[in-house]
Swiss-Prot record:
<feature type="binding site">
    <location>
        <begin position="178"/>
        <end position="180"/>
    </location>
    <ligand>
        <name>GTP</name>
    </ligand>
</feature>
<keyword id="KW-0547">Nucleotide-binding</keyword>
<comment type="similarity">
    <text>Belongs to the TRAFAC class TrmE-Era-EngA-EngB-Septin-like GTPase superfamily. EngB GTPase family.</text>
</comment>
<keyword id="KW-0342">GTP-binding</keyword>
<dbReference type="GO" id="GO:0005829">
    <property type="term" value="C:cytosol"/>
</dbReference>
<feature type="domain" description="EngB-type G">
    <location>
        <begin position="24"/>
        <end position="199"/>
    </location>
</feature>
<dbReference type="InterPro" id="IPR019987">
    <property type="entry name" value="GTP-bd_ribosome_bio_YsxC"/>
</dbReference>
<dbReference type="GO" id="GO:0046872">
    <property type="term" value="F:metal ion binding"/>
</dbReference>
<dbReference type="InterPro" id="IPR006073">
    <property type="entry name" value="GTP-bd"/>
</dbReference>
<dbReference type="GO" id="GO:0005525">
    <property type="term" value="F:GTP binding"/>
</dbReference>
<feature type="binding site">
    <location>
        <begin position="77"/>
        <end position="80"/>
    </location>
    <ligand>
        <name>GTP</name>
    </ligand>
</feature>
<keyword id="KW-0717">Septation</keyword>
<feature type="binding site">
    <location>
        <position position="61"/>
    </location>
    <ligand>
        <name>Mg(2+)</name>
    </ligand>
</feature>
<keyword id="KW-0131">Cell cycle</keyword>
<protein>
    <recommendedName>
        <fullName>Probable GTP-binding protein EngB</fullName>
    </recommendedName>
</protein>
<dbReference type="InterPro" id="IPR027417">
    <property type="entry name" value="P-loop_NTPase"/>
</dbReference>
<comment type="function">
    <text>Necessary for normal cell division and for the maintenance of normal septation.</text>
</comment>
Length: 200
């Protein structure tokens, strides 16, 4: 799996449903607040520094970006959510687009929700997790930027989030600690994603 995911390459970007690639194979989508470290997580998972653009301006990703791992397997970078500078009409467009993507996309096999370990489970995070659970999709939460906390603080946050997720979603959502800086949890996350994509 680790070698396969490192083959990820940019495939295409979609601004609306008509631009989506054929609904076949397997896809894993990545969602997260605009400053949660989603692009950095994608880069760490694929061991590529510039696969997903890391922007100084949160909310820069304004389309669904597809990265091809194999001809039958893709990673999908969803627009960062919760950023105030994105106009309301554009927010509404993305909400409708993502809603339709989740409701109709047969290739979608799992959702990774990226959350800053210091500020987990915001309303937007819960909304994305609910999308997945309602569709019967497995979801996996990455508590990113773990290197900002001590090991004991990491475990304390992990236990708290795990308890909340279990209460809200049962066994539908798993969670782990993650850091792109020191590569904490990279192999664990790759294992989850590889299983969903059929690469294991």
């Amino acid at each position: 799996m680790s070698l396969l995911i490192e083959r990820a390459r940019y495939h295409l970007s979609a601004h609306n449903v008509r631009q989506l690639p054929p609904d076949e194979g397997a896809e894993v989508a990545f969602a997260g607040r605009s400053n949660a470290g989603k692009s950095s997580a994608l880069n760490a998972l694929t061991r590529q520094n510039a696969l997903a653009r890391v922007s100084k301006t949160p909310g820069r990703t304004q389309q669904l970006v597809f990265f091809q791992v194999t001809p039958e397997a893709h990673l999908v970078d969803l627009p960062g959510y919760g950023y105030a500078k994105v106009p309301l009409d554009l927010q509404a467009h993305w909400q409708a687009f993502i809603d339709k993507y989740f409701r109709t996309r047969e290739a979608l096999k799992g959702l990774v929700v990226v959350m800053d370990i210091r500020h987990p489970l915001k309303d937007y995070d819960r909304q994305m997790l609910s999308y997945a659970v309602q569709r019967g999709l497995p979801a996996h939460a990455l508590l990113t930027k773990a290197d900002k906390l001590s090991r004991s603080q990491q475990m304390q946050s992990l236990q708290k989030v795990r308890k909340e997720l279990q209460s809200a979603y049962g066994d539908s959502v798993s969670v782990q600690v993650f850091s792109g800086e020191d590569r904490t949890g990279v192999d664990e996350a790759r294992g989850v994603i590889g299983g969903w994509l059929g690469l294991e």
